[in-house]
Regions:
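Short, well-structured hydrophobic secondary-structure segments
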Residues: 1-4
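A short coil-to-beta-strand element that immediately follows conserved catalytic motifs
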Residues: 6-16
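Catalytic core of non-heme Fe(II) oxygenases with the double-stranded beta-helix
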Residues: 18-89, 106
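Histidine-centered metal-chelating micro-motifs
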Residues: 26, 93-97
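A short hydrophobic beta-strand segment most commonly corresponding to one strand
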Residues: 38-40, 104-117
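Short coil/turn motifs at secondary-structure junctions
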Residues: 44-46, 97, 115-117
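Short, loop-centered acidic/histidine patches that primarily coordinate divalent metals
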Residues: 57, 91-93, 113-115
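Asparagine-centered strand-capping/turn motif at beta-strand->loop junctions
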Residues: 100-101
Length: 117
């Protein structure tokens, strides 16, 4: 993943944590600018669980509106279908959030950050 993004050299894991979302729990928009690569591993989730959303790094521009909201090249934000056992890797400076968890079942993820070594 790091090679595809053009990051030379090695990376090392330097922090991780467990997220447990009960009904109505959420995580506001944020990023991990201090890291290079972040990861989310879905331990317990289902189709009705809260989604993780990612915001485009391209600044909004009124001169270039979204012509088709179903076009993945112009989305302002995007969520990936999540299943138990899914691992998502992304640039740490990408803004992301978790919407309010709508169900009584618990949603559990592991999150990781990696830096250059």
């Amino acid at each position: 993943f790091k090679d595809n993004l053009g990051f030379g050299g090695g990376v090392e894991h330097f922090e991780s944590w467990l997220n447990i979302y009960k009904k109505n729990y959420f995580q506001e928009w944020h990023n991990h600018n201090f890291a290079l690569i972040s990861a989310i591993y879905y331990l317990k989730t289902d189709k009705d669980s809260a989604k993780t959303w990612f915001k485009t790094p391209i600044p909004e521009n009124p001169n270039k509106p979204i012509f088709n909201e179903n076009n993945p090249y112009t989305w302002e934000k995007y969520s990936i279908d999540q299943e138990e056992g899914t691992l998502i890797l992304f640039r740490s400076d990408l803004n992301h959030c978790v919407e309010a968890h709508p169900t009584d079942s618990v949603r559990i993820t592991l999150a990781y950050n990696f830096k250059k070594n």
